Amino acid sequence: MTESSAQLDEAASTNKLSLHGRWLGPLFSVLLGCGLMTQTEMPVPAIATACIVVLMAGWWITEAIPLAATAMLPLALFPLTGVGEKVATAPVLNQQVTWDLDHPRFGAPLVLDIKSNGQRQGSGMMIDIHNQHGVVRSETSQTSVPLAYIRAAKPASLFEVTSRSYASKFVFLMMGGFLLGLAIERWNLHKRIALMTILTLGTQPRRLIGGFMATTAVLSMWISNTATTVVMLPIALSLIVLMREKNPQVDHIRLNNFAACLLLCIAYSASVGGLGTFLGTPTNLLFRDILDQNGIEISFGQWMAFGLPSAFIFLIIIWYLMTHVIFRISLPEFEGGRELIQSELRKLGPMSKPELTIAALFTITALLWITRSFFTKWAWLQEIYPNVIYIDDTIIAMTASLLLFVIPALGHPGKTLMDWKTANKLPWGVLLLFGGGLALASAVKTTGLGAIICEAVTPSGATAILIIMFVVTTAMIFMTEVTSNTATAALILPLLVTLAGNLDVDPKLLLIPATLAASCAFMLPVATPPNAIVFAAGQTTIRQMVRAGFVLNLVSIVLLPLLTYIIGQLVFGF
């Protein structure tokens, strides 16, 4: 896969679109800047941010340079253009300034009086609380806040301000999740889970497809959708070959339809399965971080309470449409399928001690993620261990991933569950892309660019929120057919937060369907890595993928806002 990916990257960088994008992006960016400077009274930082957004969007869409390299543009361009200066500037004496807090108990923005002696008073202070509707409520607090909890106690360089996004706690949460996934892959636990699940669900063709979808979706919730598809593809191809050998009397068109349906279902369930957890796809964590920047917290367990039933409902619909409507699978019982799966399991041998250890560690980690919002609030536990209040999902992920380097791989002398050779397979480009998206989101908010754009596009009069949700979902789905879903989400989600404020609605109503839609591009091979992987196998045509994908895109446009509105209401209480 590494060699193939390198060849694809090289081809992408030399095609005409990429070459044109390298100079068209800067050209449009400069022209936009000149136009805004002469025709509007926008603040200079907002104009600079708009130009950088256009440049990054153009380079992301055309892949003029590698996506991760484009994601690093804020590190150079934000300091050079003064973006972030407001955040970096220290408060002057006798001035009220709003600061963010690291302390979990005082997480809301805090107004501090800077006294002449340089002391920041914590008693009787005023706390500014911004709710999801943008309304400000002021409360007084008699509890002192230690100075150590206040960020940016002195002026920071603009590079330092920008680079904070690349070291966001959610970047490290993603890194911890990737390391756990790599450990599962290293010891072949994911393949064993896949084979056992398929064996359990049976080998009748429609049920077999359902088994592959269920297995792929579950794996994709915890390891990358690319790795999941790579694991499932050879198993599926072996079954397809065996089915053709065992059923020579069956019309080859029906067999070809089964093959195409099976592989497309694997690709689609890899994308949809990622909706179930925050770790399933980078866009989920990007959504969480953007809400976190706006004072709204969603726990790992809360998202699973919403994501799991949503993904399950979506998978059932995809399975039914693919097997009963689009491809109409009607084949006899798969003769020899069970024997093939059992043969593959025998090749793996009995479950090894490292597999058992990783399974136990992963289970404990997942349980801690799900229950963290509860046990950190237990009074008796706080008395025994006061620092429990500082535990968050990132600390859990990093602790578990570091333990992988410490816990010995029993039965393999001198080895631990994880080594650096395996860890170095981390998708560093994805982490940089995620950090760049966060930097962009922060700049759009702090410079006021988001407010300016959303004020211009906010519909006048009473517009049903469901209609806006459908429009947002539609735009996101078809944009991500041809662009990176993480890059697109990084551009769009910050604007939706401001738009929600202008409309006086909960921002989650717009952000959730947009986030889900970013993972639901089903039509083209370039839309997602799973689509590209199964298309490269040669068992499905572009026409089949476009036909099936277009139907599922239409279903997504209707389904995702409804899932958000119905299940989201129960979980998040809009």
Question: Can you name each region flagged by the protein language model?
Answer:
Residues 14, 69, 73-77, 81-89, ...:
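Membrane-embedded alpha-helical segments and adjacent helix-loop junctions characteristic
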Residues 2-12, 83-161:
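Low-complexity, proline/glycine-enriched hydrophobic segments characteristic of transmembrane helices
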Residues 25-38, 52-62, 74-81, 175-182, ...:
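Hydrophobic core segments of alpha-helical transmembrane domains in multi-pass membrane transport
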Residues 267, 431-445, 449-450, 461-574:
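C-terminal transmembrane helix pair
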Residues 2-38, 175, 186-192, 225, ...:
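Juxtamembrane and boundary regions of transmembrane helices in multi-pass small-molecule transporters
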Residues 14-20, 40-47, 59-60, 64, ...:
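Interfacial loop-to-helix junctions that mark the boundaries of transmembrane helices
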Residues 168-179, 221-233, 304-320, 389-399, ...:
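Alpha-helical transmembrane segments
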Residues 40-47, 55-73, 162, 226, ...:
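Flexible hinge motifs at transmembrane-helix junctions and intramembrane kinks/re-entrant loops
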